[in-house]
Amino acid sequence: IDVSASFSPDAKKIVFNSDRNGRRHLYIAEADGKNVRRISREGGSYYTPVWSPRGDYIAFVKNIRPDFYIGVMDTNGDNERIVVKDFSLESPAWSPNGRYLIFYRQQRSNSDGTGGETTIHFIDITGYNERIIPTPRDGSDPAWSPLL
């Protein structure tokens, strides 16, 4: 199944994840669906790819049990690097200037079996300067507003 499509800023290409080879990997295709090629090369399963606003990177979630990672790579799959690692990380979204990622982190379940707290964070794409975005309650699925 092909899921989680994200258009390039010029709308000429899409990146998506697919289990077409057994494990979830990232693929790029022309906007019309032609010329599909796999770009992820490392181990683990890849999810939720998002094209950067400048079109130079793709952010993604990666799972190598038991941990989740948020990383970035060049649009051809080269130079994959991990930005942050934890128990559960989801929903990376680019800042309008392409220098930061916002995402949410879920803590491990509480001892009574209830889900752990979820918090929204942002971090620069080098993996430094991580900060929590204060929210009145748990937060998930963050998004940036566009530059005006």
Feature-to-residue mapping (PLM):
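Sequence signature of WD/YWTD-type beta-propeller architectures
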Residues: I1-L148
